[in-house]
Amino acid sequence: MNARNSGAAKKRIGIVGVGNIGASILRGLLAAAEPGAAEEGARIFLSDVDKERLGFFSSSRVVVCESNAEVAEKSEVVILAVKPNDVRKVVEEISPFLSGGQKVLISVAAGVPTSAVENWFAEAGVGVGVEAGVGVGVEAEAGVEAEAGVEAGVEGREGARVKVVRVMPNVGARVREAVSAVCRGKYATEEDEELAKWIFSAVGTVHSVKESELDVVTGLSGSGIAFFAEVLDAVAAGGVHEGLPYELSLAIAAETAVGAARLVLAGEKPSAIKEMTASPGGTTVRGLYALESRAVKAAMMMAVIAATRRAREIAEQKSRQIKNQNSK
């Protein structure tokens, strides 16, 4: 992580929700911290509905907050790692502290488009009076007349400038080997996207995509990690069938998969790897023939296609739910 050049390491980061993904991001950020970072003061702020869970994250760089609003108030970047159905509620809680377009919200909620999050902030009043420098919510508490916010309301609701970045990591984040896809909303800048990429590089690799491509990434990576696990289990079972203990067979299968992946990442094409190992009449070509005769390649393709189509269905369902909520 090139934190020295980006300046991202100096950002105060808030994480709302420390379940599997939120906790993985936190651990990755702490592990990637530069030497001496702890001495500079706490830069990570946490909240979660499960207060007991928060007790597991004690560190000189971490502050456990009493509320989601406190996290948003103290942070420059807020990572929303809550369930999709909870996003709107959290947006309403933190909206007074994201006005003015200075802070960045990063959402990892599956199936919730950036446009929906932006609209929810607009409905909550973020951006109201931005042109006139009035922040409804915070300023109103300080005694600014509510009518001022109402007068600016129409333009403010249309012109809310909350910078939203959407990220979809996979469960590899638990061991800092996630593959994450990043896209930005209407008001987020390229710099905001780079900031999100820096944060998520703490738990693996990151790729920029269009938001319309996220469903495919879900099928390929979000679900795909389970497909590879299925393959590993099957290969290990083959080793067991031929006499190896399962744990040894599984370890060898996983290590072999890592080697194949690293060859590909180093520039080798999958077809070239097969050519390296498949000699005429040998063991590899016999095994490849067995795979081809049972249409394993087609089955793997169909798994990605089926998962992608289901991701699209879920996204469409979520969009309909959002429209129904907005119409009430």
Each language-model region and where it sits:
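Small-residue helix-packing motif on alpha-helices
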Residues: 44, 54, 71, 87, ...
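Rossmann-like NAD(P)(H) cofactor-binding subdomain of soluble oxidoreductases
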Residues: 26, 68-80, 84-139, 149-182
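NAD(P)-dependent Rossmann-like dehydrogenase/reductase catalytic/cofactor-binding core
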Residues: 2-3, 251-328
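Internal alpha-helical scaffold of NAD(P)-dependent oxidoreductase catalytic cores
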Residues: 116-126, 157-163, 179-216, 229-266, ...
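Intrinsically disordered, low-complexity terminal tails and inter-domain linkers enriched
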Residues: 3-9, 31-40, 122-161, 321-327
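Short pre-catalytic strand/loop immediately N-terminal to key active-site residues, enriched for Gly-Thr
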Residues: 165, 214-219, 270-275
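NAD(P)+-binding Rossmann beta1-loop-alpha1 motif at the extreme N-terminus of oxidoreductases
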Residues: 1-73, 240-242
